[in-house]
Amino acid sequence: MKQYEFARHINTYFSVAQNMLFSIFLYYAFSLLIFLSIFVFKMRKALYSLLFYMCICLYIYTPVFMASLKEIEVGNYFICNLKDYPTGNCSVNHDYNKTIKLLCPIIHNKNNSDKTYDPSYCFKYDGIKDEFIINNKQNYIHNTLPGVILKSHIENDTYNLSIYPPFVVKEDITIVCICDSEKGNEGITPYLKINIKKAHGLNNDLEGDYIKGCDYGNNKGKYQFLTKSIKYTIDPICEIHAYPGDIVGINCNNYTTKIQDVSLEPNSCFGMVYFSILTMVFVKTNVNNVMPNAKYYPDLASHHGNQNSKMFLTAYLLIPNEIERDILIYCTCSYNGNKGLAIYHIFSTKED
């Protein structure tokens, strides 16, 4: 898993560095061109004044995102950098093809623990009143978006949060994820606002009301988002039949009852899965070794030291439109040594 994780980090950092260096080059190249024009050519005073004014404006009004960007769109990532902009905010329209990331400063001694990003800091957006964002933290994010995934880890004294909305959203909704205010800016709440459109599958082509999948958290009613909500003590084996273009999911946690000693295995499912071809001999492998164009949520990079793993034990797999052969994969929900086995029969052709 580490080699895939390392490759994703390298690609992201390289793209960001490339964009920054290119912007810096254009900025100074244009400035240098203006100065050279002044000394090389004999120009009228009006043109001289105009170019000089343009040069001053460049230095004053060009955003200082050359060294530190607040909003970065690179590859399949949208990154809101509130670590370097502790009084700022970002806004983004959700796109399933992009991973949304939020960087927050860690305010030590602000809370009882700074070991993880507090998931209650993400909630339904109810607007701004008197220049303050309306705090709706008591409305837990799962009440608003069952099946949402928040993954966080700490890197360079910064909370690195990845946000994955579910594939079934009953109505247009806006959520916000906030950061703690730094000392001296207590009256200002930095936040990321995410606008999410009503969705019924990736392309609004979902058959039925839920994503195909096994929910060993047994969430039902308004919390249900997968087709099979079951208890591992009653149904230790859950089987799903899936076809090219389908989305499948797994969940291990219950949203209303705290379950002790629960984990998703592999912890990077569906990035890593147990795989077999028509036999019951399974090997652990990256899913892209089996289905090269498959997409999985969350991505492997989001599992790096994730501190919210006990609360968001959910994953999704987008099966490519074409696969070469029938395959069998599985992940498990582990409960203090007992397991719920989620088996996915993925067929190369859809049944008539």
From Swiss-Prot:
Q: Name one GO cellular component term.
A: plasma membrane
Localization of this protein: Cell membrane; Cell surface
Disulfide pairings: 57-90, 104-179, 122-177, 214-238, 252-333, 269-331
- Has UniProt tagged this entry with the keyword Transmembrane helix? no
Q: Which InterPro entries match?
A: 6_CYS_dom, 6_CYS_dom_sf
Sorted alphabetically, the keyword list is: Cell membrane, Disulfide bond, Glycoprotein, Malaria, Membrane, Repeat, Signal
Q: Where is the signal peptide?
A: 1-29
Q: Which domain of life is it from?
A: Eukaryota
Q: What happens when the protein's gene is inactivated?
A: Attenuated parasites that cannot commit to infection, even when they encounter with hepatocytes, resulting in continuous traversal of hepatocytes. Cells lacking both PBS36 and P52/PBS36P are severely affected in their capability to develop into liver stage parasites and abort development soon after invasion; possibly due to the absence of a parasitophorous vacuole membrane (PVM).
SMART domains in the record, alphabetically? s48_45 (SM00970)
Domain called 6-Cys: residue spans: 53-199, 210-351
Give TM regions.
none
Please list the residues annotated as glycosylated.
89, 97, 111, 156, 160, 254
Question: What is this protein's function per UniProt?
Answer: Involved in sporozoite infection of hepatocytes and replication therein.
Name of the protein in its database record: Sporozoite surface protein P36
Q: Which organism is it from?
A: Plasmodium berghei (strain Anka)
What gene name does this entry carry? PBS36
